[in-house]
Amino acid sequence: MAVGQITWERFITSNNDARGVRYKFEDLSRQLFTYEFLSQNNVCKYVHSNPNNPGIESEPILDEVNNRYIGYQAKFFDNDADYNQIRESAQKAVKHYKGKLDLIYLFCNKALTTTCDSYKGIEKLLNDAGIALQPITDTTILDLVRKYPFLGKYYFDDHGISHEWFVNKAAITVNILGERFNADFNVDTEASRNLSIFLQN
C-alpha cells in the first residue's frame, strides 16, 4: 500500500467490520476530540459516554485552557450530509445540556455548507441556548488524522511503509548486527544468479 492513503474510501474499507463504519467514526472522532481539545488540561479527564448519550456523543467536559464546557457530535453519512439528523441531535443537546455546555464540535465526514438555511437554523437553535457550534468536516478531519500517525495506522491501515522506511529499518538492523555485519562478505548462490537475469546486474 502506498503511503498517505488517508482517504474516506480507505477508512470505509479498513473499518468494514461487525460494529460498522459509523461506530468506528465515532471512535475516531472521540480520539481526535480528546487529543485536540483536552490534552492541555492540567487534570487528566476522560470522556464519559452514557449508552445512547442524547445530543452529543459524551457528557460535557471542561476545557481548562479556554474555561468552557465542550462536547462533540460525530456524524458519518454515506451520501450527502443530512441536516435534519444534525438538527435532531442539536435539539437533544439543547434539551439536556442547556446551561451545562458552551461548545459542540461537530465531526462530519462530508463537507457542510455553513451558509445554507438548514445549517444556519441549527446554529441559531444552539446559539439561542448559549451553545456555539464548530464544524470539523471532510478533509479537515483527514488532516487531523495525519497529525496523529498512529490514528492513520489504526483507522486507515496507513502504516507508512516507504523507501525511507526500508532504508531506516536496514540501517537499524546493520547497527544491531554491529561487527557481525560485513558488507564485503557476499555469497553468490544459484538463486541470486537466476535473479540477476531479471535484475540485469
PLM features: residue spans?
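Mixed-charge (Asp/Glu-Lys/Arg
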Residues: M1-D188, N194-N201
